[in-house]
């Protein structure tokens, strides 16, 4: 298939993919994630991803709560694979790239010893709906989402491009806000594993409301 062809279903993706464990990183289907790659093993990962033609990297969070080895922590069982859609060389040995999310996956098993970077055998079929853009977005409570976003922005003295937000489809809006949200690995993982867009939006709203309530009670300063 052409290297820029859209993936139409789980069967078009490889069963074994390289994975990049990164705490707090949330990639979602059709979302964009910038990455600054500088470690030798991950530079090799990018080279291999480009060489094999798929240009795929699986983003996944390390599960530190179940890890004894900090150098090679356990992984959460669900991640999201992205395709390298932009790549630039920094001139000092780094890659500056952008991943575009394709589909979530479940880890079947980790494949050990083949490369310096980690690889996993994965299953995309539980997330077959990820291949259908904007699926379920009509069920999202957009009004509630924008209301809590407004409260969050006021509480943290932040500004956004409201014109862009108002024109964004629900899927793009929910996923972008989830990916950019300042919450911890557990909250990010919950949003990743949400069964549908409506539930992801509800989790984001609930977490934000709890964060705002906590700040009002404790008097914490706004985000800088």
Regions found by a protein language model. Name each.
Residues 1-160, 186, 197-200, 206-224:
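Positively charged
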Residues 165-183:
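Core structural elements
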């Amino acid at each position: 298939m052409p290297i820029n062809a859209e993936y139409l279903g789980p069967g078009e993706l490889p069963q074994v993919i390289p994975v990049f464990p990164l705490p707090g990183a949330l990639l979602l289907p059709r979302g964009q994630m910038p990455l600054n790659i500088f470690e030798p093993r991950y530079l090799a990962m990018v080279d291999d991803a480009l060489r094999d033609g798929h240009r795929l990297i699986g983003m996944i969070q390390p599960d530190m709560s179940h890890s004894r080895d900090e150098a090679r922590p356990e992984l959460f069982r669900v991640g999201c694979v992205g395709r390298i859609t932009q790549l630039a060389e920094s001139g000092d040995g780094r890659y500056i790239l952008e991943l575009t999310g394709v589909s979530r996956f479940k880890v079947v098993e980790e494949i050990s010893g083949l490369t310096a970077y980690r690889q996993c055998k994965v299953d995309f079929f539980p997330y077959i709906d990820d291949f259908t853009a904007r699926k379920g977005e009509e069920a999202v409570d957009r009004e509630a989402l924008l209301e809590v976003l407004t409260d969050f922005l006021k509480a943290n003295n932040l500004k956004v491009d409201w014109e862009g937000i108002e024109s964004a489809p629900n899927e793009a809006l929910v996923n972008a806000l989830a990916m950019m949200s300042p919450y911890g690995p557990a909250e990010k993982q919950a949003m990743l594993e949400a069964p549908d867009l409506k539930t992801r939006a509800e989790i984001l709203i609930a977490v934000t409301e709890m964060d705002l309530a906590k700040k009002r009670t404790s008097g914490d300063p706004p985000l800088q």
